[in-house]
Amino acid sequence: KYNTWEEICGKGRIIPAFPGVGGSFEENILDAKLTPSIIQATTFGEINGGKSERLLQLASIFKRSYIPYKIEKDMHAWQLCHLAMIVPIADAYYEAGVPEKAGEDRELMRKTAITIKKNLDSLHKLGVTLTPKKMKVLHRLPVQILSIGLRFAFQSEFGNTFMYQHSMKALDEMRALHNQFYGYIGSEEDRN
């Protein structure tokens, strides 16, 4: 999970985290926004799942800064679930004939919804807790409803800022995450 990082930085020095922010550089100026907390607050947690003093201090800093945050008990599961969702979203942009209009392609949104549900199902079968709770909701939603939600998200200002811009400007990163995620699912399924 985080062994390599601990070998590099030292045991007990890592707090796995994920920022609740998105954006991109436009003409050398960073245009970034905090994601709505209902979508994704800045999330962090201890590797062992506990609540340490340093974790509570970090939470206090975010609270005083008015930055939405959430302490997550199992960051490894959280990050896997995040990948289960964002990898197919990025893939949809790359498959679209006109990436900025991906949300208008009903069949592509249906395929994306099916892939997200399949990814979450694979994680669930591997014993990964679906977290945060919205991942359990996505896992249970009918494909038709999820694909409609994706169409709205892809065509929204939110989708442009937090999904499209990152997917298009971080192509190498997203391809690497694609390969790592599906490699992880495949290798874990082979072991079981």
Q: Which residue stretches match the model-derived regions?
A:
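Positions that flank functional sites
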Residues: 22, 77, 138
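Short glycine/proline-enriched coil/turn segments at helix->beta-strand junctions
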Residues: 9-12, 67, 185-188
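Internal alpha-helical scaffold of NAD(P)-dependent oxidoreductase catalytic cores
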Residues: 11, 32-130
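NAD(P)-dependent Rossmann-like dehydrogenase/reductase catalytic/cofactor-binding core
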Residues: 117-120, 124-192
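Short, solvent-exposed polar/charged micro-motifs at secondary-structure junctions
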Residues: 24-28, 79-84, 142-144
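Conserved beta-strand termini and adjacent loop/short-helix elements that scaffold enzyme active sites
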Residues: 17-19, 72-74, 133
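Rossmann-like NAD(P)(H) cofactor-binding subdomain of soluble oxidoreductases
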Residues: 1-31
